[in-house]
């Protein structure tokens, strides 16, 4: 949701990949809180990520699970890391992903989500261009005031063409 992350004066988790957020919450639950808080945090970790503004279905179940639409976050974080940290082309990222996730995802699934990643990464740049200040936590950052410079109207066409030729 555009503007949801932009309303705050400081983006505390902007530099933390989604997969790392889950592990951080698990660590805090197991190492730093009382039993009641631990149960709450572990329940949050076990809940699929979804847009919180969409109401549950008639059975109280989550109607829209984000990973069903955009793909597994572990793949997206992998793609993001190798794209930003090393500047690898889609073909090299695809090759590495097939090695890293070979027993988990087949080649077509990796290709599908790699294509989705690049399309969304380029199409959503306008959201990153106006992020509030935030910390750089790891070795990569998508903050426009830090490591990442990209025009909001950049085209992803050459990236998708390379993926189509895999």
Annotate the PLM regions.
Residues 1-166:
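ATP/NTP-dependent adenylation/nucleotidyl-transfer catalytic domains that generate, transfer
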